[in-house]
């Protein structure tokens, strides 16, 4: 499921009180800015592993409580449920019998204590929330409840595999050991590394979350998130009308020798990791009289790779060398993007042969709950031929330096 997206509903009826506030929404920017002091930011990171940001669910919950009549009224009556999408689905699927979430989703709310794996009273107080508003935190392959899909199934089936989409993709890629890394290219991008059973010390713009807790065994992850990947290509198609089909971007970009000095910084809702600047907005820089549609398209493709390189640099600084990254998501089929990303990172990218890695990961969690014991089989994933770095180091440095100058212009 989507992780940071915030949902609110009445406990008594199960009816939603407001539209879901998606993970991309920055409406709580002013709220987090008001909370931001060096001391507060340090405490938030120490407790939750996350940067104080409207990206995470806590600020969205607080915004809903302060600005929407429905949630405020339900809270006054003790009838308010806040949750991420998994908690909402579990509640609905079980007919209101289970108000639960798993540790991977809970760790992305900015309310979970990463050491105790329970809701933090300190963070609840910071955001003006109450524990009773939040679901019970469970292991990722707990028995969350049963559902017959309102009679569509002949009998109730157990719900016993729940994971945030990015963590599920890490599991689906078979990254069970410390240092295993994956790159999920969807609406946005997640670059994630298995950090092992001990909470890692991460620095810079990287955050720490819970990967999963399966059969009592805990996995932490280090991660960097990029806001616009597939969404950037959709913008080229639907808003600028530079392409008719999203699949066209790779061949068009590959048809140029280079970007012609054009850089696109897709900060439509701010810059995510490693910058965490919600106040920055998008820009296209370096346009000249010879710049055309193709240069903007290539600049968009390259921007995805440059942002991944930004995150990769921070991850290797915190977690050590990462010689291989598994890639999943729709953009894994874009050969230009895969090769250019491998060139910028200086490491091999191996696209997954499976299309829906997040679903596979959640399914694996459920299988472990139901008694499957072939854990080595989880790591035996099939991947397509990899993309290895092929660009000359001097050219790579020139390209990446141009990107860093473009970003610096906006900061």
Mark where each language-model region is.
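N-terminal cofactor/phosphate-binding cores enriched in small/glycine residues
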Residues: 1-8
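Conserved hydrophobic "DFG−1" position in protein kinase catalytic cores
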Residues: 8-9, 193
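Carbohydrate-associated surface elements
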Residues: 25
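Active-site core segments that coordinate phosphate-bearing ligands/cofactors
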Residues: 29, 35-99, 110-121, 125-128, ...
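Gly/charged, well-structured mid-domain segments that form the phosphate/adenylate-handling core
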Residues: 140-143
């Amino acid at each position: 499921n989507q992780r940071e997206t915030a949902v609110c509903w009445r406990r008594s009826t199960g009816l939603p009180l407001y539209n879901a506030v998606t993970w991309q929404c920055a409406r709580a920017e002013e709220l987090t800015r008001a909370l931001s002091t060096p001391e507060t930011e340090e405490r938030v990171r120490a407790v939750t592993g996350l940067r104080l940001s409207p990206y995470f669910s806590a600020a969205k919950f607080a915004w809903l409580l302060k600005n929407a009549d429905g949630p405020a009224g339900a809270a006054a009556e003790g009838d308010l449920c806040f949750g991420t999408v998994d908690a909402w689905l579990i509640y609905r699927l079980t007919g209101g019998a289970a108000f639960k979430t798993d540790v991977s989703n809970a760790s992305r709310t900015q309310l979970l204590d990463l050491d105790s794996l329970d809701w933090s009273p300190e963070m609840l107080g910071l955001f003006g929330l109450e524990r009773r508003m939040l679901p019970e935190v469970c292991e990722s392959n707990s028995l969350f409840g049963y559902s017959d899909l309102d009679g569509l199934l002949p009998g109730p089936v157990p719900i016993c595999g729940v994971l945030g989409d990015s963590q599920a993709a890490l599991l689906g890629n078979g990254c069970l050991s410390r240092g295993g890394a994956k790159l999920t290219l969807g609406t946005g991008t997640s670059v994630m590394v298995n950090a092992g059973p001990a909470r890692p010390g991460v620095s810079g713009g990287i955050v720490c979350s819970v990967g999963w807790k399966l059969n009592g065994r805990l996995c932490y992850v280090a991660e960097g998130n990029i806001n616009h990947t597939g969404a950037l290509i959709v913008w080229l198609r639907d808003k600028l009308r530079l392409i008719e089909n999203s699949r066209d971007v790779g061949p068009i970009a590959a048809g140029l020798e280079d970007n012609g000095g054009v850089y696109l910084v897709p900060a439509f809702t701010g810059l995510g990791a490693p910058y965490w600047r919600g106040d920055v907005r998008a820009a296209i820089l370096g346009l000249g009289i010879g710049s055309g549609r193709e240069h903007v398209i290539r600049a968009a493709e390259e921007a995805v790779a440059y942002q991944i390189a930004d995150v990769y640099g921070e991850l290797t600084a915190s977690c050590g060398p990462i010689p291989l990254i598994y890639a999943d998501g729709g953009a894994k089929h874009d050969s230009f993007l895969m090769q250019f990303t491998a060139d910028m990172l200086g490491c091999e990218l191996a696209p997954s042969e499976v299309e829906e890695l997040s679903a596979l990961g959640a399914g694996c969690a459920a299988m472990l709950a139901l008694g499957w014991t072939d854990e080595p089989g989880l790591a035996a994933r099939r991947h397509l031929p990899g993309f290895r770095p092929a660009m000359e180091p001097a050219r790579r440095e020139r390209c990446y330096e141009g990107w860093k100058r473009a970003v610096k212009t906006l900061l």
